[in-house]
């Protein structure tokens, strides 16, 4: 990609000349080859993703957002990970499947779309989940039409001010909702198999931020007004933990209160959003943040013991 426009930032940089510094290699600071920080079974996604055996998660380093509270800060901002070939990426998929993964869960994949497309040149025997921050180009979503069965986008913001302040993306809502609607056009209504695993469809996630209930209510209204019951799944998350640079923003440098979550949940129920998930209070714990230690990235014969 010598003129990158894979995401809404449309940096138009030459990704072949990437240097891991913002301003020199596009917003995501990524080259052509994927940088992977962890590849392992993950048991803490929504039940229709993790199931009983775990999702086959592949965590990519870098990001096209700069969320100040990112729980994956070590890899999204600090770029911890190992650059691998497209062929090695495909091998990782099959290693995870051999371990029992219900699916292949690509976490923060947007900036490596072209490498991922190549790695999925032939279909996999399990669904592929595109687990993204929501700040997507509809053209990139369309490009992946025949490769992705399950879309797992965040819908972080309905308001411009928090989108700009916390993620440097004032146009987030417009871009994310357009992308989500394109995802739905491609998959149609969600389908869950007899094993409880999502086979195709869209699962929209929203993480409630402390002190930002109006932002959350805007997201909930959008979902209720745009999709009918049975069309998409929705996950109302309370797992916020102050992380990354959250300490620089006093208003979000705390956990969510029980009252805040209950108000958001009640509003969701009032709007008639019934397909999906809520979270227990104990989900707000750093223990659920994976160790980004390179597990599963190197070829088995090259792993260090």
Where are these regions (language model features)?
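Alpha-helical scaffolding segments of alpha/beta enzyme cores, especially the outer helices
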Residues: 91, 95, 114-118, 122, ...
